[in-house]
């Protein structure tokens, strides 16, 4: 009986702690550009907003001063990607350019230095591995891209996994993920990569939003092996174009779009890598897809995105989970 009561108390405390955190609207001193199919990363205390449909400026939000600063425009249209911070610079890799439904993979990596306010072209992506709507991340000073699509929203969803070593300027192909998916974000906790969400965009057969992938795939860097979690551990709310971010030992899947509803999803679900279970967190104030999320000193921020499935309305609002 005592053990049962103790368990109930622990669960109650966990729920109370989760509910104590909530999404707050941030009101900046000035506004940024409305955009979607963009990405977001953090450099120091700044949120760096980049890309989207059309050519747009890079913009950074200083958390301390609550102000936006406008930087130079992107060298070309950049959309559908997961920007990363590599040694204090922002890298754009696994992105699209051009219009729907035949967006074209950007063949090169582009790197933005916020201090110099300038772009430079980085390494070329191997020709037969170019795609957009891919996940990207850094692990032990190497850069990775995972899954994506080769022909815009038309066709070519894949499970490719590639590693780039900036030190040696070499690419390496790794084992394909168990499931093909695009419009996916990647998150790493410890030595494991977690993939949740995404879909198989296939406009050539009028199947763009509805072929969502519920399974969670995990890559163990120590063993070099993929695994798929049980069906009971599937993503609770199937969607694509969601943001993926790490908070402690949890992977948060935020927002997204699907054929289930017109409005973008406001759902925030966290996969606890210690209990190996999903937790339901408070919803966003405004559902959104086609953007990113970052963790800055234990607070999760998201900016911009699309308020409905598809291409609009474009947002410029900021929310923080604290």
Q: What is each stretch, according to the model?
A:
Residues 20-322:
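Kelch-like beta-propeller repeat domains
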Residues 6-16:
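Bacterial N-terminal signal peptides
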Residues 1-4:
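Positively charged n-region of N-terminal signal peptides that target proteins for export
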